[in-house]
């Protein structure tokens, strides 16, 4: 968001729009709500998350913290804990390489996490 100690106004605006969408979903008149998001910038002052999960808790040997905001459901239970051998923040790992796929890779939902969500919350 900041480059050279200057605020990138476009990214800040997009972050504010993202927060507005988040808050609209969180405030929805629904008994059960789950929102998944990477750790947001502190400048946006999101409400506290209810759970932090890692891909390595669901069978993927990668460290990439993802936050969950849950209401009306039980916390997601790890299904296949493995030892991580890659971190999305380490220079040179597959996860953060530049190029056309970088944004897509950073937004990736790991299949093991999606499967756990479907199996644990899909019948609610």
Residue ranges of each PLM-predicted region?
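Conserved active-site and SAM-binding loop architecture
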Residues: 1-124
